Amino acid sequence: MKKHIFFLLLFFSAYIQANTFFNVRDFGAKGDGKSIDSPAINAAIDAASQAGGGTVIFPAGTYPSYSIRLKSNITILLESGSVLLAATTTPENGYDAPEPNEYKQYQDFGHSHWHNSLIWGENLENVTICGQGLINGTGLNRGDKNVLGAGIGNKAISLKLCRNVILRDLRMLQCGHFALLATGVDNLTIDNLSIDTNRDGLDIDCCRNVRVSNCTVNTPWDDGIVLKACYGLGFFKDTENVTITNCFVSGYAQTTLLSGVFRTEQPVAPDGDKPYGRIKLGTESSGGFKNIAISNCTFQNCRGLALETVDGGSLEDIVISNITMRDIFNSPIFIRLGGRMRSPQGTPVGTIKRISIDNVNVYNADSRFACLISGMPDHCIEDVKISNLRIVYKGGGTKEQASLIVPENEKKYPEPDMFGIIPASFLYVRHAKNVEISNVEVSFLTPDYRPTVQLEDVKESVFRNVKINQPEAPKLFVLKNSDKPVVLK
């Protein structure tokens, strides 16, 4: 009996400890929108950590802050009406300095450092950031390639080599280079976030066992939800076992999603083309992408789906289904194996294989680039199956464009515009093997006089039940150094 009582006391002691609450105002935070509250917030986190864990509460109010340093076994709870505000750097005060990284040459500055953030954690476990409040990153810098000095923050949330992390129910606004940079994080759950920012939304880099669901991400100047596998950790690590489901990505003018205005007038993206906003695998791809499932997602006023490996990683076993897109500014589907090779010397070219894309509906897509599947000479993309695809393109392609030569550009940054206008109206495939396209219907808002499909160095292709809705349809196939495709009704 005494033994049972002892264990019950231990259990309730652990339960109370794990559910201890720490109000940031009790540690000196004012929440008045003027005072810098990060010292008080960090004191509350330290107290919770010393107690063995707990919940750090932000009541309603605005909390200007510099770097907030997470600890293990901590929940950050932003209550309704609370705003965690990224403060503007001053000569006297600012964010934590970017930590040294001897592998920084393999990726941009923004991917190489984690401490120069509004909220950051490293080598932690059991961390939750949640609540109905807002993270406002107004004071963060949005640059990525240029080195930023001490005191300048460029990410809202950065996590490195952590496990058992949950992000839920937050709203995030203007969050610098990344709303979230998670690198080397295992067992990561991201649910019901609303993000309206001026660069990347969710960057999931070298992570394993990730669940992204029910998120709304508006990123006109960069990618919305993006999986990466850089070399910033100093070793190769795949991003694997990831599901992305029930999400909405867009490229509306920044701040207009959370405000409900959904304004489409905005300057072009940093690369000189139309807004981003999409779901993408890549560009950083020293490691690989394996066992990825993307389903039930909507793209609006943004670029299309992109699957890219250009730094030596393997991209394989990818399943994508039930996708709808509207007002798409470049290729609805872009699959690229390239040779940029931002990896240690001697890293071989990567691979792409076993890709399945099913049940995709696209309306009002830019016709310049068509759907693109492009490997490299002697490095074929393999085993791609695209089925139940309906696309309505803008059209407008000319007969003269049908003779355009598509450059290889093996080392160039991967975007559809790297190839210029494509000589096919629906699909261009190059350096690929075992490609199957079935149950496809393609229409054009204005006539397009380019051939429908161009195959270049393609082996073992099958086209089944492909319908082209266009009067005076031009040639269906153009073949260059390719096997004759099997065409089935």
Task: List the model feature ranges, each with a label.
Residues 1-21, 258:
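Bacterial Sec-dependent N-terminal signal peptides
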Residues 17-489:
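Extracellular/periplasmic carbohydrate-active domains that bind, remodel
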